Amino acid sequence: MKKRIFLKMSSAALAGAALPHLNSCKQVDTPVAPQGGQAAARLKNWAGNLEYSTGNVVYPESVEQAQAFVMKADKIRALGSQHCFNRIADSPHQLISTKNLNKVVALDPAKKTVTVEAGIRYGTLGEYLQGKGYALHNLASLPHISVAGSIATATHGSGVKNGNLATAVSGIEFVTAAGEVVTLSKEKDGDQFLGAVVGLGGLGVATRVTLDVRPSYQVRQDVYENLPFGELEKNFEAIMSSGYSVSLFTNWQKNNVSEVWVKSLIVEGKPATIKTELYGATPAKRNLHPIVELASENCTEQMGAPGPWHERLPHFRMNFTPSSGKELQSEYFVPFSNAFAALKAINGLGDKWIQDLFISEVRTIAADDLWMSPCYKRPSVAIHFTWKQNTDSVMKLIPVVEEQLAPFGARPHWGKLFTITAAQLRSRYERYADFQQLLRLYDPKGKFRNDFLDLNLA
């Protein structure tokens, strides 16, 4: 998940230079100025660690406009809500932002689906669905991210039975390199649909998405403090199954998990069974931020207060608009069966990053059949790192983390920082070659390719 930890520390403590060079972590091409004049000011991502390689950005307000922009361009790349930490959405030539394609197209109660434009944000969609009595199966920790961008990178929430956000997709519409509008559906397009959903922006510009919905539901959120790390060895599955969505937060110090966030469904007529202690962790006495020292007013309500799904499943409130946050993020997915071994390997590194790590979050995600999803064919545990913008130190630590997780076939989050090579990715994704072929099918001349795809899908 490309999540926002709303840090409230001094600018001196958080200061870090922007990183115009980050790809997965490689150099990008020389930026190309728009034709006919001086280059426009360039956008940055929301964390401020990355400046995009061109100020040549177009903002279609209709599918027809998107088609026209794509047909006119020699090279172009789709840009979502700018929440990625690497250059997956970058291009030195031209960017096409879907921020103005942000409406609900149709709600179909009979099929239990909602069709939306690509740039709508999950928080906005959540409010709409709740007003109609419907819900999505899960949300990421930050509700401000766009639907199409989140799907393209397999962004996720938590829950042992919950797939990532892309698993809710039943149909997708995108503009191809030829300017044609293609619609693929789970019902009609089978394997090709499964390859296209987590498309990494390589098949075209997503314009509409159809998502499965369900009746609205209520959730309560309870937080526990100070879970002994050793309890994870025998009780990891029980702990992560103690709610509909469970997250662990730790800085890997003192063999301690500082917080356990348990989000539980409220079933009408069935009293909630909330534990007075959770394998040695005790209930928090107040609302908490994932970093316990920080103020919690931007976090979703805790202390067991019932609320609608879209106000409890995220960690942070929709009505707080995030500003640029001085942080870096990386995340790796390992098989659920290797959970404790992987966590133990990382826990042993804790002393290496005392000065560089804000917090880590551990979540679970159900297996899926989407080709480029990090959870393809395996129930997974996601180990996330929110780093300080100590760029030089962090970029040395990331390969150390990857080395420890390599025995478990760790797959990186596509929108966060990693140095795993294309050869390693190829060995860890069964459908890697099939996806390369799918890219060539829809984009034979590489109109949507960029350095990120060239590096990681060589």
Regions found by a protein language model. Give the residues of each.
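Short glycine/threonine-rich loop-to-helix capping motif typified by GTGT followed
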Residues: A17-P20, V260-L265, M303, G307, ...
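Substrate-recognition/cap regions that form aromatic- and gly/pro-loop-enriched pockets
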Residues: L313, R317-Q424
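C-terminal segment of N-terminal export signals and the immediately downstream linker at the start
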Residues: H21-A68
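C-terminal substrate-binding/cap subdomain adjacent to the FAD-binding core in PCMH-type
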Residues: K2, V32, S170-L349, Q355-D356, ...
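Glycine-rich N-terminal segment of FAD-binding domains in flavoprotein oxidoreductases
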Residues: G48-A140, A154-G159, L248, V362
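Structural signature of FAD isoalloxazine-binding scaffolds in flavoprotein oxidoreductases
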Residues: N86-A106, G157-G179, V205-D212, V381
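Activity-critical C-terminal alpha-helical subdomain
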Residues: F408-A458
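N-terminal secretory signal peptides and thylakoid transit peptides that target proteins
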Residues: M1-P20, S24-V28
